């Protein structure tokens, strides 16, 4: 650990930046108050902003994602004249999107099925979003990041526990009644890890990681450690900056040391990528870093900021409890939209933003703003009518919630400050792509007896056909291609299969690699990891009532891994995702494939322009503090202006601020 920086102007300025960033990250406000408690009071306890002595203002909110909707709701309830402009003509919610049946579209064969294109899990330590879900009466149930025992836990009839937040001030905020009978299901680890042609269950890897690790040519102590332990051990020296180990548990240092410790973490490590940190600071071998990247799904993000991965270690790990919204995450923005029907204007894309900045000597010629006029003018074009003339909107001030990656294509007059322009131009937005496949039966939950029973329902001998197929012990085996299968087994168990001729043609060129038969997965929720292009897969945590099937997140990939999928047509994605799913689960899963799926590339989304803001090295200290700084009457909010990138909680924190 390094000490306070030497006393010169450059290091003093950098140290002050790091202190400000630490206080923002920890939500430490003026007078060392906990801002999270203030946000919970505003958003949940009262649902209203504090009293204002300003005259009623006209406010434009740009973007009807979660930030724009909540900001609009609070401002409307406070008596302001609010208009929310959204480019998407068909929906609100931004990167909260659920594939589901509507009156215009049905993505899956079973109209009851749904799956998430975007946000899918809400961690226990994000109290703002969880309490908002409860306040809106949407309900919540557990999302199983690790598969569980189906007959364990307290069951759906027992109420979920209340949302609780313990502040660094010692105060505890809670929302709702205790649920003393609530019990989490037992974690099992039946899902798979497959890398370098070796496949084991997650529980077996945790107990004995050598088989998988040897495939990465690890030796010595590294070969005997699960990758999650390698990373956690590597991060212990960083945690020492702001916490101590007391009786085997991490405890924050006294307040001033805690805040300054985080500031030192930012100062010392913002210049690292995650790969650089593991190699140059933690001393992991290149082989160990490759294993970490593959099994923790971070290979494609090793070049990005250390800080993002460091914070994510708390966000996505097996020990955290997660929640989901029954019926889909779309219900959250939809519930907010219900109270803003008159304020939201869909189908209007902002192309020009003019604003009056009182700190400047004069306004540019030809603008419609000024000291005696409106503070902001926005020009939009209609998404559903390219021939329509642009429309002009005026207001006293604007709150811009769209991603900087989208704002980059808006003409802004006058030019904003240099640091703001840097933030808009340079903020790195990563890619994320999902490929979801629908199956008529929940084969991932099957035992081997279930497999026998269900396959024999299709036709006598189908179970034996798969069981006795050619095996590949060391060398790739070629099962009959889809075109050669006598029974046409792709989708064989599905009435009115949606498998298209295009899918069959693509599949006919892709023989299955590896054994045709795999052990029954018998996994309830959770997910598997692989080094094939699918990377991470997730099984549904809960059945859809009245449905025998489900939708599997067959591929969830980021960054360069996602870009490979983005080059394919949808039909190609479905067939490749199915083949790679079969590599882990055996060929026989094909009989339940309905031929229907859904896929989403956030990098190719014309409104999102990327999955989320994820900094590269140095970006946080270079311009993050300028990301949310107002430019005259123009304010900025969204997950990209928080330090909880890619999470709904971050979007809620900055809008409330």
UniProtKB/Swiss-Prot annotation:
InterPro entries: Amino_oxidase (IPR002937), FAD/NAD-bd_sf (IPR036188), Flavin_monoamine_oxidase (IPR050281). Residues 1-12 form the signal peptide. FAD binds at residues 86-87, 95, 120-121, 350, 639, 647-648. The precursor form is proteolytically cleaved by an endopeptidase into alpha, beta and gamma chains, which form the stable mature enzyme. Its cofactor is FAD. Keywords: FAD, Flavoprotein, Nucleotide-binding, Oxidoreductase, Secreted, Signal, Zymogen. It is an enzyme of class 1 (oxidoreductase). The keyword Secreted applies. Its main location: secreted. Its EC number is 1.4.3.11. It comes from Streptomyces diastatochromogenes. GO terms for molecular function: L-glutamate oxidase activity; nucleotide binding. This is L-glutamate oxidase precursor. The recombinant LGox was digested to three fragments (alpha, beta and gamma) by proteinase K. One of its GO terms (cellular component) is extracellular region. Proteinase K-treated enzyme exhibits improved affinity for the substrate, increased activity and increased thermostability. Pfam families: Amino_oxidase (PF01593). It comes from the Bacteria. GO terms for biological process: amino acid catabolic process. It catalyses: L-glutamate + O2 + H2O = H2O2 + 2-oxoglutarate + NH4(+). Optimum temperature is 40 degrees Celsius for both recombinant LGox and proteinase K-treated recombinant LGox. Belongs to the flavin monoamine oxidase family. LGOX subfamily. Optimum pH is 7.5 for recombinant LGox. Optimum pH is 7-8.5 for proteinase K-treated recombinant LGox. It is found in: Secreted.
């Amino acid at each position: 650990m390094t000490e306070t920086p030497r006393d010169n102007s450059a290091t003093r300025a950098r140290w002050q930046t790091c202190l400000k960033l630490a206080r923002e990250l920890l939500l430490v406000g003026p007078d060392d108050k906990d801002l999270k408690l203030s946000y919970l009071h505003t958003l949940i306890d009262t649902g209203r902003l504090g009293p204002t002595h300003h005259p009623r203002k006209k406010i434009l909110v740009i973007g009807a994602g979660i930030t724009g909707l909540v900001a609009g709701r609070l401002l409307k309830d406070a008596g302001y004249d609010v208009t929310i402009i959204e480019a998407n003509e068909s929906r609100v919610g931004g990167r909260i999107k659920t594939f589901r049946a509507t009156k215009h579209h049905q993505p899956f064969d079973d109209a009851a099925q749904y799956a998430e294109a975007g946000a899918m899990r809400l961690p226990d330590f994000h109290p703002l979003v969880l309490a908002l879900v409860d306040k809106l009466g949407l309900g919540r149930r557990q999302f199983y990041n690790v598969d569980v025992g189906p007959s364990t836990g307290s069951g759906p009839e027992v109420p979920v526990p209340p949302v609780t937040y313990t502040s660094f001030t010692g105060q505890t905020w809670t929302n709702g009644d205790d649920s003393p009978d609530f019990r989490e299901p037992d974690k099992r680890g039946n899902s798979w890890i497959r890398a370098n042609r070796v496949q084991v269950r997650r529980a077996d890897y945790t107990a004995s990681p050598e088989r998988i690790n040897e495939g990465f040519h690890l030796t010595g102590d590294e070969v005997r450690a699960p990758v999650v332990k390698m990373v956690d051990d590597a991060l212990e020296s960083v945690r020492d900056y702001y916490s101590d180990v007391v009786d085997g548990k991490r405890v924050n240092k006294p307040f001033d040391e805690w805040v300054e410790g985080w500031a030192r973490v930012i100062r010392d490590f913002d210049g690292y990528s995650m790969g650089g940190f593991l190699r140059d600071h933690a001393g992991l071998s290149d082989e160990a870093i490759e294993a970490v990247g593959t099994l923790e799904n971070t290979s494609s993000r090793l070049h990005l900021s250390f800080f993002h991965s460091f914070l994510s270690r708390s966000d996505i790990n097996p020990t955290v409890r997660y929640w989901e919204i029954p019926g889909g995450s779309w219900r959250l923005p939809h519930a907010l939209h219900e109270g803003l029907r008159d304020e939201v204007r869909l189908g209007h894309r902002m192309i020009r933003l003019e604003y009056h900045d009182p700190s400047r000597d004069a306004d540019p010629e030809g603008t419609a703003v000024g000291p005696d006029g409106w503070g902001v003018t926005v020009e939009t074009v209609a998404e559903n009518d390219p021939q329509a003339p642009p429309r002009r909107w005026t207001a006293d001030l604007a709150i811009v919630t769209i991603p900087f990656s989208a704002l980059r294509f808006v003409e802004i007059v006058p030019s904003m400050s240099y640091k703001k322009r840097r933030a808009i131009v340079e903020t790195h937005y990563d890619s994320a792509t999902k490929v979801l496949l629908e199956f008529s039966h929940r084969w991932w939950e099957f035992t081997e007896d279930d497999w026998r029973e269900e396959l024999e329902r299709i036709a006598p001998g189908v179970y034996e056909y798969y069981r006795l197929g050619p095996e590949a012990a060391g060398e790739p085996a070629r099962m009959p291609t889809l075109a050669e299968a006598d029974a046409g087994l792709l989708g064989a168990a599905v009435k009115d299969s949606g498998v298209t001729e295009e899918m069959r043609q693509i599949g006919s060129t892709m023989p299955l690699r590896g054994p045709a038969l795999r052990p029954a997965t018998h996994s309830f929720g959770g997910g598997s990891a692989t080094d094939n292009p699918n990377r991470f897969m997730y099984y549904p945590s809960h059945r859809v009532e009245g449905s025998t099937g489900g939708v599997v997140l067959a591929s969830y990939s980021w960054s360069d891994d996602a870009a490979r999928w983005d080059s394919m047509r949808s039909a190609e994605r479905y067939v490749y995702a199915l083949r790679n799913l079969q590599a882990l689960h055996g060929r026989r899963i094909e009989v339940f494939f309905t031929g229907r799926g859904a896929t989403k590339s956030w990098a190719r989304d014309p409104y999102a322009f990327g999955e989320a803001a994820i900094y590269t090295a140095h970006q946080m200290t270079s311009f993050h503090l300028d990301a949310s700084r107002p430019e005259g009457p123009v304010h900025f909010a969204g997950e990209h202006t928080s330090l909880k990138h890619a999470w709904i909680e971050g979007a809620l924190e900055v809008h409330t601020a």
